[in-house]
């Protein structure tokens, strides 16, 4: 696998983890409004995004490639 593909996979891992982080933040927002159904929905979505990141990580590890975790950006509150 060339270096560009490895870099793109690492970037995708960060995007998946950012999405999970964002969904947890949205779930927290709905939880504060006592909208438990919405909060639960977004927590499920967060878990799905985390699982995606773990699949990419496991793929890279199984093929002997280094996983580089970067900082996860803070979500902008627009909701």
Residue ranges and their predicted role:
Residues 1-79:
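Iron-associated oxidoreductase/ferritin-like identity signal
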């Amino acid at each position: 696998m060339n270096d560009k593909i490895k870099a793109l996979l690492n970037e995708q891992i960060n995007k998946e983890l950012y999405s999970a982080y964002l969904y947890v933040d949205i779930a927290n927002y709905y939880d504060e409004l006592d909208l438990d159904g919405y909060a639960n929905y977004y927590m499920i979505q967060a878990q799905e995004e985390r699982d995606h990141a773990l699949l990419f990580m496991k793929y890279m590890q199984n093929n002997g490639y280094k996983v580089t975790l970067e900082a996860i950006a803070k979500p902008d509150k627009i909701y």
